[in-house]
């Protein structure tokens, strides 16, 4: 069994484009595995879909509408037993501009 609480770094990523998000998650996992740390993920989280309906006609024709949607894809990566080498490698990692990253460290 474990000897005590271990620190877990939880990385949550969001993007509108799932291909860019998956590539970023793959880059993070490869970087963490190269530094001999334990990684769980990427775990796909539910996609948030925001739908907007607008009238396509400026005056009449209430039945004529257009629907638009924005999909926000999310992934979760957990890093267990992260060393200083792992954190330094993650800081040097360059990710695309369309990916929003939130990092949280906690003890398990």
From Swiss-Prot:
Disulphide-bridged cysteine pairs: none
GO biological process terms held by the UniProt record: translation
Molecular function, one GO term: structural constituent of ribosome
A Pfam family per the record: Ribosomal_S10
GO cellular component: small ribosomal subunit
Similarity comment: family membership: Belongs to the universal ribosomal protein uS10 family.
Subunit structure: Part of the 30S ribosomal subunit.
Source domain of life: Bacteria
Free-text function comment from the UniProt entry: Involved in the binding of tRNA to the ribosomes.
UniProt KW keywords: Ribonucleoprotein, Ribosomal protein
Keyword Ribonucleoprotein: yes
HAMAP family (UniProt xref): Ribosomal_uS10
PANTHER family: 30S RIBOSOMAL PROTEIN S10 FAMILY MEMBER (PTHR11700)
Protein name: Small ribosomal subunit protein uS10
Taxonomy of the source species: Bacteria, Pseudomonadati, Planctomycetota, Planctomycetia, Pirellulales
InterPro entries, A to Z: Ribosomal_uS10 (IPR001848), Ribosomal_uS10_dom (IPR027486), Ribosomal_uS10_dom_sf (IPR036838)
């Amino acid at each position: 069994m474990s000897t005590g609480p271990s620190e877990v770094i939880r990385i949550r990523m969001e993007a509108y484009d799932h291909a860019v998000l998956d590539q970023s998650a793959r880059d993070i996992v490869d970087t963490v595995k190269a530094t001999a740390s334990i990684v769980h993920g990427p775990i796909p989280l539910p996609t948030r879909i925001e739908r907007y309906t607008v009238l396509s006609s400026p005056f009449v024709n209430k039945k004529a509408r257009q629907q638009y949607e924005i999909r926000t894809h999310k992934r979760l990566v957990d890093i267990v037993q992260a060393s200083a080498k792992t954190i330094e490698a993650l800081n040097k990692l360059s990710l695309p501009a369309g990916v929003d990253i939130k990092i949280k460290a906690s003890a398990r």
